[in-house]
């Protein structure tokens, strides 16, 4: 664990009776996994992306912020990612991990953070863990393998967008625009392209095989929006 470093998690949340009735249950399980596993000082920036019901927390913790987005046509997941990154940068977090509510973390998340903060390319790199459901072969695994390696980041060989992490310096070196957006602000009819596009700007794409994330991959909420496909 690297001393005097703090981490921000950015998480998109969605619940709907038609497409994702268990959305809040997923998020509760996600929260439990982060709060029981992460040893670094952290803050979780959650975005309730136009859920049918409003996510409410009794006795809200100081390091948990939930922002309600009333219209996900405003930009979908990408909007929440960008807004969460802006909040994290404003509050001087050293690393930012982009996630969604259908993921479960264990203590290997600390190895993930160690690598993000100490890797030789940390000032211009984007990082991703291993997972059971990464939509590619090079991140697919069912446990950590202890290896850390670079991939090209080009289309068909990029980190999957389910979990992407960067240092503050990498974000500041690779903004998409002057408004402080890190990801392409295009509408999500190009869903699946934002995570590809950003890796064309960031110089290095790194697979962190010391970390494993269980990805439930329940993205049915995307069907709400016409033309939205991953």
Give the role of each language-model region:
Residues 5-11, 34, 43-46:
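Hydrophobic targeting segments
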Residues 41-51, 67-71:
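Short beta-strand/loop segment that forms part of the nucleotide-sugar
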Residues 18-19, 47-57, 104:
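A conserved acidic beta->alpha catalytic loop
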Residues 24-42:
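Short, acidic, metal-binding catalytic loop of nucleotide-sugar glycosyltransferases
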Residues 71-88:
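Glycine-rich, basic loop-to-helix element that forms the pyrophosphate-binding segment
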Residues 106-182:
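Conserved catalytic core of nucleotide-sugar-dependent glycosyltransferases
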Residues 93-104:
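Short beta-strand-to-loop acidic/aromatic patch adjacent to the donor-nucleotide binding site
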Residues 23, 180-230:
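C-terminal catalytic/acceptor-binding lobe
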């Amino acid at each position: 664990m690297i001393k005097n470093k703090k981490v921000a998690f950015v998480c998109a949340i969605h619940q709907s009776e038609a497409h994702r009735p268990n959305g809040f249950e997923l998020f509760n399980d996600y929260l439990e996994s982060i709060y029981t596993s992460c040893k670094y000082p952290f803050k979780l920036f959650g975005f309730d992306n136009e859920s049918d019901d409003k996510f409410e927390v009794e006795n809200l913790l100081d390091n948990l912020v939930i922002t309600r987005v009333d219209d996900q046509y405003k930009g979908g997941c990408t909007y929440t990612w960008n807004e969460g990154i802006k909040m994290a940068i404003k509050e001087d977090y050293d690393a930012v991990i982009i996630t969604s509510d259908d993921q479960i973390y264990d203590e290997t998340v600390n190895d993930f953070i160690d690598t993000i903060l100490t890797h030789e390319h940390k000032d211009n790199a984007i990082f991703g863990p291993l997972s059971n459901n990464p939509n590619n072969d090079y991140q697919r695994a069912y446990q950590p393998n202890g290896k850390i390696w670079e991939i090209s980041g080009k289309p068909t060989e990029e980190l999957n967008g389910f979990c992407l992490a960067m240092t503050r310096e990498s974000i500041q070196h690779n903004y998409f625009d002057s408004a402080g957006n890190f990801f392409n602000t295009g509408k999500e009819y190009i869903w699946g392209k934002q995570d590809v596009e950003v890796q064309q700007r960031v110089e290095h794409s790194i697979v962190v095989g010391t970390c494993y994330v269980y990805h439930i991959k329940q993205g049915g909420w995307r069907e709400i929006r016409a033309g939205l496909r991953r």
